[in-house]
Amino acid sequence: LLKLGHDVRLIAPAYVKPFVKRQKNDAADAEAICEAAQRPSMRFVPVKTEEQQAAAMVFRGRDLLVRQRTQISNVLRGHMTEYGWIAPKGLVHLEKLAALLTDPSAVPQGVRSVCMLLLDSLAMLDRRHTELDKEIVRRSREDAVARRLMTIPGIGPITATAILALAPPPGTFAKGRDFAAWVGLTPRQHSTGGKQKLGSISKMGERTLRRLLIIGSSAVVLQASKRGAPKGSWPEQMMARKPRMLVTVALANKTARIVWALLTKNEDYTAPVAAAA
């Protein structure tokens, strides 16, 4: 449609739903879309380029492989538990179960054959997962913006490439807080009657980015708790008075704002200087 000269605008279905009257059909949907598109405050979804769609497909495929790998590992542990062989959570502990399956007397032959098939599927998923990880790392090394994003603490090749593939242009947001809100890292509001009430994070928007930012921030907070944060720094002050998970989410929010500033101003990341005691 863009090549034909049309002005294409995408609207999230959740914003169109309130304008649908009674029954759902093509005519009612078209009327609701026209009503929603004419609203001056309507938020439109930016159109992604083919390169962004291709990069996003890499992440969707990787997430699918991770979910399938987790499902198979859970099924394998569950089957072995029924015969008295218990393994903790985590793929690394499945090696013990794999070693047990080499012993014909450990479990019945029928169970052993099924579990060996599951282990073969896990090995195949691991190989494909590794291939996609290599592709993501290659993309991050070839992109100058991704290399600049990776200088931010808690952001590696996967998160940097995901930001470029899944996030809209930084100019879509007026400030860093708007970008953090789009990711779903700002408090959910329950305000009324002039009384402001904030709850947990909204968890709206792009959940893949939110998950990656929280995982990266969790690694930063864990390292700071073990090795100690710089005296007078923001993490050191927060960890002294707040739970670690709360600090992790707050750091993810802070990281999202830094990402927006980096993309908007085309600048390199500069570590903040700790305040003097």
Question: What residues fall within each predicted segment?
Answer:
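A detector of single, family-specific signature residues
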Residues: L1-A277
